[in-house]
Amino acid sequence: MSNYKIKCTTYGGKIGWFLRKHFSQYTSCAYLKLQFALRRKLYKNYIKLFNQRAAENNCFLPCLISIETINRCNSSCSFCPANIKNETRPFQKMDEALFKKIIAELKELNYSGYLNLYVNNEPFMDKRIEDWYRYAKEQLPKAKMLLYTNGTLLTEERFCKIIPYIDKMIINNYTTTMSLHPNVQKLFNFVKNTKEYWNKDITIQIRYINEILTNRSGVAPNKKELMYNNEICVMPFTDFTIYPNGTVGLCCSDATEKTCLGNINNESIFSVWTGKTYQNLREKIANGRSNYPFCKGCDFVDAGIRNMFIKQQLK
């Protein structure tokens, strides 16, 4: 039996849930301080290696490329600036020709990192998402297809259609009661009882919908206060974020698309990634977030995928 049989996590069980629900401000602060401390040396070492490789014209490609195919979500998470109640961006869907241009460029680069068709949205609001993941996987067999979803639109039919092309699926089950959404519960039961999917890496994360997390550079609805710090951030060295109109944003924390590092409609992924705008950003961030206007008050901490990639490169 595979170790990948569908998993559920609550981040600390009932005690963790109680603390996040009733003392969310404190748990957020404690978590962030701990994570910054744990990551500081790791990030410095990776940035040093990244810059060495770049100087030798052998720059690391992004470990995570995120493509937002539609800029809408159907959830109301209080910590997210792109939730259904707070969304301020004009509605946009990515043109298919632009998507295929992106995939063609990644194919030419022999891309083998993570590809995620999601940024600040719900992927299954785009009815093309199953076909686009299939196309991406067929064109980029070495890439690891990553999918984040809240699961509310993920039926058995859509799951069966998309899962052959997904390497890692994370279902963020947002709730107030520490229970699974009815749709997610149905999916959990289906996968649990269908052996052909037991070798798939699927995790359901049971998350408190009103939890205080990070300020996302001041745009998180329930945590707008900025936390001025001089911590470095690794995301300019690991992430490449593309919005539906082709704009390359700084990172997923830029949920209102204030930053622009280039546009894939008239530039290539590689030219943007290795270009002067990105290089100037990295030089500033490598010396602390306070050196870049958008980042100086941000307290966002990266997820585990980046850490795994960094540790592999530093071996």
Region spans (language model):
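C-terminal accessory region of radical SAM enzymes
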Residues: 2-6, 10-13, 188-222, 253-303
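Short cysteine clusters
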Residues: 73, 77-80, 233, 251-252, ...
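Conserved AdoMet/S-adenosylmethionine-binding subsite of the radical SAM
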Residues: 103, 126-237, 243
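Conserved alpha-helical substructure of the radical SAM core
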Residues: 2-168, 181, 305-311, 315
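Exposed loop/turn and edge beta-strand positions of beta-sandwich/beta-sheet ligand-binding modules
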Residues: 63, 236, 255
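Short, P/G- and charge-enriched loop/turn segments at secondary-structure junctions
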Residues: 52-56, 225-229, 237, 284-286
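Processing junctions and N-termini across compartments
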Residues: 67, 71-74, 227, 289-292
